[in-house]
């Protein structure tokens, strides 16, 4: 996936995101990128709807977005940063680990996650670390550090 950001205002549509990330339904979790500084930072939106498959079982009487999917959405925003770095080798960067992740509030259908990720480090052009935060209505719902690795 070698597409470079082409919009003047540093936003990406869902179609452009599909050109950058390998994720597809039901794991394409980013709806739109609303701010992007290539190689440094990205801010994206995830609209949480009752139609998502996880809500059939998590939990039918009180649907809550699973924390692992919030973290995965943050990782995908981090992936947007990594895919836009021209000095890195092309290939598949995968989620390799998490540190200090905290869940602070539930996320429910009807919420809009505003996810911000900032690049913390890149090592040997193969490993990366980003700081991620997810907010709903201006309130922090999840934060942590996410690691990436290039798969040969």
Curated annotation (Swiss-Prot):
The entry sums up its family as follows: Belongs to the thioester dehydratase family. FabZ subfamily.
Subcellular location per the Swiss-Prot or TrEMBL entry: Cytoplasm
According to the UniProt entry, its GO molecular function terms are: (3R)-hydroxyacyl-[acyl-carrier-protein] dehydratase activity
What does the record give as the active site? 58
Superkingdom, taxonomy of origin = Bacteria
User: Is Lipid biosynthesis tagged as a keyword?
Assistant: yes
- Name of the protein in its database record: 3-hydroxyacyl-[acyl-carrier-protein] dehydratase FabZ
Which is one Pfam family of this protein?
FabA
Q: Is the keyword Lipid biosynthesis assigned to this protein?
A: yes
Functionally, this protein is described as follows: Involved in unsaturated fatty acids biosynthesis. Catalyzes the dehydration of short chain beta-hydroxyacyl-ACPs and long chain saturated and unsaturated beta-hydroxyacyl-ACPs.
Q: Which GO terms describe its cellular component?
A: cytoplasm; membrane
One example of a Gene Ontology biological process annotation: fatty acid biosynthetic process
Catalytic reactions of this protein? a (3R)-hydroxyacyl-[ACP] = a (2E)-enoyl-[ACP] + H2O
Identify the keywords attached in UniProt to this record, alphabetized.
Answer: Cytoplasm, Lipid A biosynthesis, Lipid biosynthesis, Lipid metabolism, Lyase
Question: What's the Enzyme Commission number for this chain?
Answer: 4.2.1.59
